[in-house]
């Protein structure tokens, strides 16, 4: 009964939204949003950098995250550029780092002296972007914002050989490594009781072995198949990584025997092998953070 409702619900979702993709934004609507929000974003960012009062900074950070979520490319590009430029050390920091570089403690120096030098170095490398990113990451929707921001920074750094975007990438990655603590990562099995919207999202994110129909998705969640995904509460249902398994009799000699048109099935009680036949890490903003490996270990 639950499986029938799940399939029906999934089919309804696919029919309402198109098979796997979102409807494109209307160009006229996009132009209107761009011209309206660019100035607003610039004003909010400037106020955030100038404000020292804590509650005011939190409110402005939340407003910036909301503006980013509206997905207006020119507004996103402006915020990315402002943060990237703030991620580079300024002249005063370069001088301070130079002084610290020539002030290494002697061998056998007291522990307190070494700790004080370390604290000075940490203060010296903290850029203007650090405090802003702290506020943005703590805002509602902040974790997803940081993931998307890093994806954009990686793209700009690779495309334009942009040092500022590379610096921003490193700053955001350091925060995500703290926020994505293993204690907050949840492992879930996906099946026909999984909400249809989540199954649709996983299907849309599967790029290695695309899912082109509901029947294909159904076959990958059959009794002799399994799927698992990792989630973080700050990502609001967006999977960090997911893996597809097949339970087989022996080791298949080709992938076609698992997902090909003539793939066979094996009663679960007769299977003696679990084949991890595909794994995806679909969030570009989490690149290099090992969630695929974590999923295999889990």
Regions found by a protein language model. Give the residues of each.
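Extended, composition-driven regions rather than compact fold-specific motifs
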Residues: 1-298
